[in-house]
């Protein structure tokens, strides 16, 4: 949690290997995460199967010609059988209630629909952890309420959620542990009740 510009998104990009630390190290499964390790196809595949990143701007992660192709892209890249790809795709489409969007082009969807598709894309790979950058940004109240409930359901199902937000209510609703980044980049950790 923190205000705009304090480094929340940069921290999440570091955690997901989209940018690299200039100093210090951090690890995944005992291995240092850096440009070299993520160029190793075996390590990169293992990492991205276990950690899913959902961008603040869903347009950044949507690129296929229709929603079904978009959601099936990740499982195909994992080398799963077409039968398993279809099962996972159908399962997350049903879970997120987006069957009516299956054949639609992602760039023609509303902001809330795009966010649901972006989440479906990541969930189709069944990662252990979801990293979400400002998940409520740009969503109407109804979609925000739905998304908070959905994230709580994922948390109850055992998913690890790492969420950046400047929304106090969301932070306190979702967090077991809250890391607050100040404007001066000072970090404070708070354990929620």
Task: Please name every model-derived segment.
Residues 130-133:
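Catalytic Walker B motif of ABC-type/P-loop ATPase nucleotide-binding domains
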Residues 105-109, 113:
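Conserved ABC ATPase signature
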Residues 16:
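Helix-to-loop junction immediately C-terminal to a conserved catalytic motif
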Residues 24-36, 47:
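Conserved ABC transporter NBD signature motif
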Residues 165-166:
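H-loop/switch region of ABC-family ATPase nucleotide-binding domains
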Residues 83-101:
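Conserved ABC ATPase "signature" region
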Residues 119:
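Hydrophobic anchor residue at the start of the ABC signature
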């Amino acid at each position: 949690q923190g205000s705009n510009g304090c480094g929340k998104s940069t921290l999440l990009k570091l955690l997901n290997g989209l940018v690299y630390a200039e100093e210090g190290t951090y690890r995944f499964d005992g291995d240092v995460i850096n440009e070299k390790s993520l160029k190793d196809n075996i390590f990169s595949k293992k990492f991205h199967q276990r950690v899913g990143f959902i961008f603040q701007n869903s347009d950044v992660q949507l690129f296929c010609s229709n929603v079904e192709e978009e959601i099936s892209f990740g499982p195909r890249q994992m080398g799963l059988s077409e039968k398993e790809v279809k099962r996972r795709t159908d399962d997350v489409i049903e879970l997120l209630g987006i069957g009516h969007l299956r054949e639609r082009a992602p760039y023609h969807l509303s902001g809330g629909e795009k966010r649901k598709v972006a989440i479906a894309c990541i969930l189709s790979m069944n990662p252990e952890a979801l990293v979400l950058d400002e998940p409520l940004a740009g969503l109407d109240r109804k979609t925000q309420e739905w998304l908070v409930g959905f994230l709580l359901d994922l948390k109850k199902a055992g998913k690890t959620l790492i969420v950046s937000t400047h929304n106090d209510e969301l932070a306190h609703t979702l967090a077991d542990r809250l890391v607050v980044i100040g404007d001066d980049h000072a970090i404070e950790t708070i354990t929620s009740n």
